[in-house]
Amino acid sequence: MDEYSFRIANRIVGNHKKAPGIEITLSGPKLLFHHDVVVAITGGKAEVDVNGNPVDQWAPIFIKAGDKLSIGKLSTGCRAYLAIRGGIDVTEYLGSRSTFALGNLGGYNGRVLKLGDVLFLGQPELPSCTLPSAVSEPTKIPESLIPSYDFNANKSWKVGVTCGPHGSPDFFKPESVDEFFSAKWKIHYNSNRFGVRLIGPKPQWARKDGGEAGLHPSNAHDYVYSLGAINFTGDEPVILTCDGPSLGGFVCEAVVAEAEMWKIGQVKPGDTIQFVPLSFEDAKSLKSKQDSLVESLQGELPSIETKALPKPENPVLGEVQVSPNAPKVVYRQAGDRYILVEYGENVLDLNLSYRIHKLIEMVKDNKTKGIVEMSQGVRSVLVEFDSEVTQKQLLQTLISYEKEIVFENKWKVPSRVIKLPMAFEDEKTLAAVKRYSETIRAEAPWLPNNVDFIASINGVDRSDVKNMMYTARFLVLGLGDVFLGAPCAVPLDPRHRLLGTKYNPSRTYTPNGTVGIGGNYMCIYTMESPGGYQLVGRTVPIWDKLSLGSHSVNPWLLSPFDQVEFYPASEAEVDECSERMNAGKFKVEIVDSVFDHGAYLKWVQEHSASIEEFQKNQGGEKLEEFNRLIQISNAELATNGGVKLGEDEKFSDDAELVYSEYSGRFWKPLVAVGDEVKQGQGLIVVEAMKTEMVVNATRGGKVVKIFHDNGDMVDAGDLVVVIE
């Protein structure tokens, strides 16, 4: 999350830049070493000692076998980093040694570290070791390289961003963009490696809805997100970070500059952020200077204060106008290392998917310099590039390729028909909806039942929604929605495209294998994760983590242009099939085929009368009514913190008022009113950033009052317990 601090930690101990280390959130571990090693601890300030003797951060620490290293609570910042000379020897998975805890992948058994875990260090002399050797001797660094982490609600972090990919006047009103940069955004307690949620002014939208993509103006046809994108999930902004989603259907107003992402890794609940608009050139310059600092260990961190643009930039870098043989193409700035290439108007058109397919093929065939990766969305492709090419050069190259693509209407691509079992509205699916209503938002148009909402807004019966799920064939247009190869797929029959909207705010939990509908699209969730689609049922896992299945050349099951069908199954059958799938024993029914767009257009034409009738009847007054409800019912329902003592609440003169040190959700009390407690004893648990933190008694006595109920919001400084 704070790449700068992690890189400096590796430099201090002399490690290769790819050596794995440990990221520590809010409170650190105690470690017993069995070998002589050199370590370094960077990031936020914490109490650090070896065998009870204090040691310095941001400097080499020489450890002997048998020594115990203790890292306490962070007093500034949110994260600290521990680098050990030689690195930590964990297996590489999909090109990384990082832990993706949400997906139970990578790192140490795919999870956070626990009491009793044994970590093995890199030993390059052993043939089995795949870690790179240390590259330099341990060294001290000048204080000028150590950032300040002393920020809070009254002293805002200044974070540099580039504008776009979505801006004004097409998505946000101009005054809303101005407010975005002038506002001080508070960090929400529910922030983590997935994303940093922000609390601030509601955006002023320049459009009433997302068209075919959904009923909320934040909805977009699914596209691939940039790392660091500030993503509006409904009216709620989230900064997408290391473990964030790959592809989704919400607009992004700005992207945090790559050199500024370390700050996002250090903000904690209750802190405030003010965004600073930067030019693309200044954002790249900041990254270049930061890399130079890490390599040379000389100089000081550059300031962004003098680099602020007088007004936000237009994120549109260029356009190719529509012609008889080609759609309109818009090239949008999507950070300082991405360009989002967007095709056509805001409608679903399979020709656009084929055009994206041809562009990706051209880049591969020409081995285009500087392009790192191309990631396909519904009507767009995200192009990641490196320092081998400038933004301007890449833009010119992409435009020149576009002119070479020949328009075709009768195209064919290889396709597989994949048939999966699905239990409609199983208990786990319904429990996820109920959990949302109990913990995030009690009332919304899609509550208490998502299927009822879909049926009502489309003027059909709930049985029609069920029949659609079992008779439709869904064409995969993008992957990674939200994670791990989850498909964004569209029903091929236009009569199966049901209007809807996504959750606002999004869910924090969706079961693995859940099937959702959002706007025109279907998604299968490939892990327990946040999400926004309306939930209708559950199928088998389609991410094969261990690649045990005969179908699994790669962990992901689906590819663009695959076609997915569901067949009815009971909840017990889906559970059994899921167990067999995870063990590599479930045989997925796969038929190799070809998607013939010419034949598809002919079929659509043959059924045009019934398709037009369906589209005419879809929505109407019901759609207008639901649109109205969504417009007036978009505020997240949450309990305010900041308990005030009422006039009738009198305590003795020697009463001890205990305040929370943390911002988060009141998780549970550890004591009850009337209990006798000792100084230092745990009183309550506050949950934030996937971490449980205990507020301890500041003195001994009797508990006479506990403020808040389970699930309430608590801010740092809020009164939580009274002891007499």
Predicted regions and their residues:
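Conserved "landmark" site that anchors the functional core of diverse proteins
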Residues: 1-648, 716
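Hydrophobic beta-strand core residues of beta-sandwich domains
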Residues: 55, 63, 113, 267, ...
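A generic "binding-loop/recognition-motif" signal
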Residues: 67, 379, 662, 673, ...
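Short hydrophobic beta/alpha edge segments that flank linear recognition/processing sites
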Residues: 119-120, 270, 675-696, 715-724
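A structural micro-motif recognizing beta-strand termini
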Residues: 164, 199-201, 520, 661-663, ...
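Short histidine-centered loop motifs in beta-beta connectors
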Residues: 260, 265, 551, 667-676, ...
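Acidic, low-complexity mobile loops and tails
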Residues: 641-684, 694, 700
